[in-house]
Amino acid sequence: MLVLSCILNVIAGAGLLILGYKHYRNTRELKRLRKLSSEKKRITSDLLLASQIQKSMMPLGHRILDGVEGYGTLVPAREIGGDLFDYAIRDGKLYMCIGDVCGKGAPAGMLMAYAHSMIWSLTISETNPARIVTSLNNLACKDNVSCTFFTLFYGVLDLATGCMQYCNAGHNPPYILSDKLTMLDCDPNQPIGPVEDAEFTLQEITLSPGSTIFLYTDGLTEANNTEEREFGPERTEKVLEDCVKRQLKPKDIVDTVTAAVHHFTEHAEQSDDLTMLAIRYR
């Protein structure tokens, strides 16, 4: 009987040890999960703030500047996007740009912010688009050990004459909507970042009053549906041709293209930033 009692006491003690260990393990796991939850909330909050700051750098929505009407949208695939666009008027000229950084998320967003600030810094002392893009490329090449790059379209429109000088660095050629739809002729310059001292060509076109410039990133043409088919340039042009026939204003053009993309992609996950900018020359 004494032996049995000892055995039972040992078993009971072992049970208490097991219960105590489980309680300790559960408590430690709960603390770890709480810490992870707190860290996740902090990261989410930081990303939200970064996204708000990023969007504040761009002229989202509808604007009218000296009779020039513009409308732009940016829908990032993640909290922070790698696309950029901007436009402003100074000394009778309309400066415009749109770009797409390779990659997504925070790294792409940081490069986008750097490129955005440098573009306008260079514009203070220079109006030639090719020279601005060349200077931007040389700056981007410094200490670029990761070989990060981005595409960019940069244009300067003389509001008095309608003459637009522009330089395209590997970006999707814009469209001109007037009495017909035309893809802007763009030389195949390389993107910004990989090669220092690269040459970028200057091009020129004269726009007629009432023309609309439609700029976009490849998040439009490469938008996938649930069957992994791309929206593509043909669908893009078909929608824009309809906009020409209906003589739509910048906001209506962007909204029409956006609706067409959403209808095409349905419930497919967005894989890339979607950015569009339409500017109507008075």
Model region roles, listed by residue range:
Residues K31-F214, H263-R282:
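… and, occasionally, acidic/histidine-rich disordered N-termini of signaling adaptors
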Residues S5, N9-A12, Q203-L215, L220-R282:
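C-terminal catalytic subdomain
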Residues Y24, G105-A106, M110, A223-N224:
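Charged alpha-helical signal-transmission linkers that cap and connect PAS-family sensory domains
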Residues M1-L30:
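Alpha-helical transmembrane signal-anchor helices
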